[in-house]
UniProtKB/Swiss-Prot annotation:
Subunit structure: Heterotrimer of UreA (gamma), UreB (beta) and UreC (alpha) subunits. Three heterotrimers associate to form the active enzyme.
Cofactor binding remark: Binds 2 nickel ions per subunit.
Principal subcellular localization: cytoplasm
Gene: ureC
Subcellular location field: Cytoplasm
Cofactor(s) named in the record: Ni cation
PTM comment, free text: Carboxylation allows a single lysine to coordinate two nickel ions.
Binding, Ni(2+) 2: 219, 248, 274
Domain (Urease) ranges: 135-570
InterPro entries: Amidohydro-rel, Metal-dep_hydrolase_composite, Metal_Hydrolase, Urease_alpha_N_dom, Urease_alpha_subunit, Urease_AS, Urease_asu, Urease_asu_c
Catalytic reaction annotation: urea + 2 H2O + H(+) = hydrogencarbonate + 2 NH4(+)
Entry protein name: Urease subunit alpha
One CC-aspect GO term: cytoplasm
Length: 570
């Protein structure tokens, strides 16, 4: 016997379906579901009197060895940079995405996908009405505090690349012994990690020994001297070893100007950190590098989005971060040269155009670990308010093109740049089951569940002595996947191919799986999903700092109010 449900009644029971729109948090962004994989009337739902019972939505007698899922997250709305915006069931086996589609019991339900069979060995975290996104990546982290890992997970970030300590300011771990210690320390946390070595050396041997010790990439920082010779040496070694090079260029233009750095890079792939320049880099024109295919640009979150407070906050942050003395005029001039309202205003617009491809934190060296995802969506909201719908969204009553552009900035694009997109960055089948589940009203700021390697590691959770999980205070807390040996089974440490082939994990006693980065030297701007725009003509006026693209002034007004802010964090 069938029953016809109104669209509203269906949504209350099973969540939104094809053609429905969801508002993301308290932003102005609307996501429209492009496809629903479900079979109406045969939805897999867990609970008393629901369908996920033996012989109904759960196939009797089917073992995990025979193909039953380990986990199913049913009836989720998926927002993914590759898959788009869909509704479906997410199946997990052996810590990986088994598929997205229709899950259930093929004996009793129509349309069940072969790889999404629910059996007695299948567990669930009901995702009805929730939004699922890939675990976020932050590939610009200063590992100065061990609490960063908890803040990352609580915000939806499951992969962390960076370095420590480097004076606390340079995003690199210096020397083979220090790299090994950081790799060992990271075993304590249920995240994917990778550590950058110091690439500032005019000779190759010190760089090579760090790569062989387990570094996943190289970092060039002006505080260690980002000279043309250093840049050339690091890139030469990186090309031989297949690791990425990240660069913080010379703010003071002491060892050369932007043109000299460009010449030293010589067409080779490089990740340009905080490309706007407030975080550091050739003043005032480092932003011009976004116009080249081999330059892979990212922003750091302190300057995103541009608000009425951005300029004043940054000046003090630069002084502290780079050990500058406010009583020394030259130090003050150094800080002031980096903070330019005009280029910060242009940064928002260039993100919205898809010319800046990634968002990162720069945690504890001006940026905030837990705000990568939040500030990405605040920027998307601000740009819709100020620039209107993107051309691809006009006439759709939704913002799908803009949403895909922005979610790619902290998922698939940094995964490609880091050389780990085979493993993370999207919810494509075969990748790690790093999944973040959000209630739509809390999207972008407070995840409901964080799944790492197919197992819950963090979630909203009430008082442990309460009668229910919902007993106040409900707050972000660790789950069982974050403790014991489970955290090793669900996490991955990324190292260079040389270190992987030399069994660095066994050498230093790592229990987490170790995998090599690869393909870092062939990636270009054209590979940046939804963010591949490379302006042919971008100019920064050396006097006014105004930014022009193809002769048109690129700017925006500072925001006085933002979504995903005090309303959620009182």
């Amino acid at each position: 016997m069938s029953r016809k449900l109104s669209r509203e009644a269906y949504t209350d029971l099973f969540g939104a379906t094809e053609g429905d729109r969801l508002r993301l948090g308290d932003t102005n962004l609307l996501a429209k579901i492009e496809k629903d994989h479900g079979t109406y009337g045969d939805e897999a739902v867990f609970g008393g009197g629901k369908t996920m019972r033996d012989g109904m939505g759960m196939q009797s007698g089917t073992t995990q060895a025979e193909g039953a899922l380990d986990w199913v997250f049913s009836n989720a709305v998926i927002i993914d940079p590759i898959l788009g915006i869909q509704k479906g069931d997410i199946g997990v086996r052996d810590g990986k995405i088994a598929g997205i589609g229709k899950a259930g019991n093929p004996d009793t339900m129509d349309g069940v996908d072969d790889e999404l069979v629910i059996g007695p060995s299948t567990d669930t975290a009901p995702a009805d009405g929730l939004i699922a996104t890939p675990g976020g990546l932050d590939i610009h982290i200063h590992f100065n505090s061990k609490e960063l890992f908890e803040h990352a997970l609580a915000s939806g970030v499951t992969t962390m690349f960076g370095g420590g300590y480097g004076g606390g300011a340079t995003t690199c771990t210096t020397g083979p012994e220090n790299i090994k210690r950081f790799l060992q320390a990271a075993e304590e946390y249920p995240v994917n990690v990778g550590f950058y070595a110091k690439g500032n050396s005019s000779g190759p041997d010190p760089i090579i020994e760090q790569i062989e010790a387990g570094a996943c990439g190289l970092k060039l920082h002006e505080d260690w001297g980002s000279t043309p010779d250093v840049i050339d040496t690091a890139l030469t070694v990186a090309d031989e070893e297949d690791v990425q090079v990240c660069i913080h260029t010379d703010t003071l233009n002491e060892s050369g100007f932007l043109e000299d750095t460009f010449e030293a890079i010589d067409g080779r792939t490089i990740h340009t950190f905080h490309i706007e320049g407030a975080g550091g880099g050739h003043a005032p024109d480092v932003l011009e590098l976004i116009g080249y295919d081999h330059m892979l640009p990212s922003s750091t979150n302190p300057s995103m989005p541009y608000t009425v407070n951005t300029f004043d906050e940054h000046l003090d942050m630069v002084m502290v971060c780079h050990h500058l003395n406010p009583d020394v005029p030259e130090d003050v001039a150094f800080a002031e040269s980096r903070i330019r309202s005009e280029t910060i205003a242009a940064e928002d617009v260039l993100h919205d155009m898809g010319a800046i491809s990634m968002m990162t934190s720069d945690s504890q060296a001006m940026g905030r670990m837990a705000e990568v995802i939040t500030r990405t969506w605040q920027t998307a909201h601000k740009m819709k308010s100020q620039r209107g719908a993107l051309p691809a969204d006009r006439g759709t009553d939704a913002d799908n093109a803009r949403i895909k552009r922005y979610v790619a900035k902290y998922t698939i694009n940094p995964a490609k740049v880091a050389g780990i997109n085979e493993y993370v960055g999207s919810l494509e089948p075969g990748k790690m089951a790093d999944i973040v589940l959000w209630e739509p009203e809390f999207y972008g700021i407070k995840p409901k569940y964080v799944i790492k390697g197919g197992f819950p590691v963090h979630s909203e959770m009430g008082e442990a002595n309460g009668s229910l999980m919902t007993c106040e205070p409900v707050m972000q807390r660790s789950r069982m996947g974050a403790v014991g040996k489970a955290k090793h089974a669900i996490s991955t440490t990324f190292v260079s191919k040389a270190a992987y082939e030399n069994d660095i994990g066994d050498q230093i006693g790592l229990e987490s799986r170790v995998r090599p980065v690869e393909g870092t030297r062939d990636v270009g701007k054209n590979d940046m999903r939804h963010n591949e725009y490379a302006p042919e003509n971008i100019d920064i006026d050396p006097q006014t700092f105004e930014v022009a693209v193809d002769g048109e002034h690129v700017t925006c007004e500072p925001a006085e109010e933002l979504p995903l802010a005090k309303r959620y964090s009182l």
